[in-house]
């Protein structure tokens, strides 16, 4: 049983293209399955989270991060009485629009597109993927996901001001998203903050003493772990502390959100949608702990010279490949050249690059940067 304020599958506003019901899967379960089986989801395996895959096979990538978000979302969503199928579908789709090379790749694409008076947003790109770019079905373009999953994709980590983005007006921009979508924003934060600590420590870029000195939440959890396992190896003490950090964040999120729902007398999906603010959140003390952790990661991990150098190299390749395609559109695959006949070239190039994996972009750049003496008609293209 789900709570009255959870979004039941039978209440869905449906799909853009009507389909008959499935005999044993509800609509949100079908959405989950379609996301898992689409090409864009598989490409997340070779998209950077923080560390590029050249460092270790054990560091997170966009795919493993997404799986971790989905796992936490199902658990936290179930504890709150939410629809765990919708939670899972939204979690699996939340990063599907990210370009190669992590957030630096998104920033780079955004800056390139602003040169044409536009911009790049990975949520909007994700919506385009599931509505148009994925081609798996004979009866419709895209994945034909339910309204609620598409709404959750476009509202991930942001609200819209009145009159903003009129092209997205069908997605009830003036209303708050369902609780399941609100939950994903915080679960995403829990997953990447704890995972980045883990990967940073594993890479030797972060030391336990340094983390304890700057992150009170970790310091408290490490002291507890050290008391429980005084003879354990340092790595195992770190693991125990990090496990407790994750559990503390998730437990606080569930507990504080449940209290908010009770205090604000939230009894229906309509109450959620019409509420002036989002209802899922950390408690104020935990929000401050989380903010402190994020500040530490930015100062001591994300700005580490090793990672800065990686980001700069990725941005140079992305910028260079963008310029090549803009000056030589004949280098684009046939389907994108066809689009360029009736769409602005910079958007076609942006969409193509945004869908690439780290490795594919690097290979394309290395091949095409020396194209002066090649005939583009003889260039072999790999679908992305």
Pin down the residues of each PLM region.
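Short alpha-helical catalytic segment bearing the HExxH-like zincin motif
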Residues: 87-92, 185
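A glycine- and small-aliphatic-rich helix-loop capping segment at beta-alpha/alpha-beta transitions
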Residues: 102-113
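Basic, low-complexity intrinsically disordered segments
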Residues: 80, 91-92, 162
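Short active-site segment of divalent metal-dependent hydrolases/proteases
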Residues: 93, 97-98, 191
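Histidine-centered, transition-metal-coordinating active-site segments
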Residues: 1-63, 70-76, 84, 105, ...
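Conserved short loop/turn motifs at secondary-structure junctions
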Residues: 92-93, 110, 338-339
């Amino acid at each position: 049983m789900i709570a009255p304020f959870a979004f039941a599958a039978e209440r869905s506003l449906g799909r853009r293209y009507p389909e008959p019901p499935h005999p044993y899967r509800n609509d949100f379960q079908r959405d989950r399955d379609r996301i898992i089986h689409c090409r864009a989801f598989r490409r997340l395996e070779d998209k950077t989270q923080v560390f590029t895959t050249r460092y270790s096979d054990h560091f997170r990538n966009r795919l493993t991060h997404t799986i971790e978000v989905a796992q936490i979302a199902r658990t936290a969503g179930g504890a709150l009485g939410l629809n765990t199928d919708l939670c899972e579908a939204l979690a699996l789709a939340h990063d599907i629009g990210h370009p190669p090379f992590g957030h630096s790749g998104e920033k780079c694409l955004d800056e390139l597109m602003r040169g044409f008076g536009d911009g790049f947003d990975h949520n909007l790109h994700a919506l385009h993927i599931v509505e148009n770019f994925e081609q798996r079905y004979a009866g419709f373009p895209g994945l034909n996901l339910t309204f609620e999953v598409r709404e959750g994709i476009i509202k991930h980590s942001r609200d819209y001001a009145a009159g903003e983005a009129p092209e997205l007006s069908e997605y009830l921009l003036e209303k708050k998203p369902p609780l399941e979508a609100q939950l994903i924003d915080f679960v995403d934060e829990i997953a990447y903050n704890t995972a980045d600590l883990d990967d940073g420590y594993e890479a030797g870029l972060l030391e336990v003493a340094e983390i304890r000195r700057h992150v009170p939440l970790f310091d408290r959890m490490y002291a507890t772990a050290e008391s429980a396992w005084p003879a354990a190896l340092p790595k195992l003490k770190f693991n125990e502390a990090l496990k407790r950090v994750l559990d503390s964040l998730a437990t606080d999120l569930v507990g504080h959100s449940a209290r908010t729902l009770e205090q604000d007398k939230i009894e229906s999906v309509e109450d959620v949608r019409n509420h002036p603010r989002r209802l899922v959140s950390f408690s104020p003390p935990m929000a401050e702990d989380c903010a402190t952790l994020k500040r530490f990661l930015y100062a001591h991990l994300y700005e580490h010279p090793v990672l800065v150098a990686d980001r700069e190299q990725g941005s140079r390749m992305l910028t260079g490949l963008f310029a090549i395609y803009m000056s030589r559109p004949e280098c684009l695959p046939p389907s994108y050249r066809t689009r360029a006949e009736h769409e602005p070239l910079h958007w076609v190039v942006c969409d193509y690059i945004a869908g690439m994996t780290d490795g594919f972009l690097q290979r394309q750049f290395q091949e095409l940067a020396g194209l002066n003496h090649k005939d583009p008609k003889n260039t072999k293209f790999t679908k992305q």
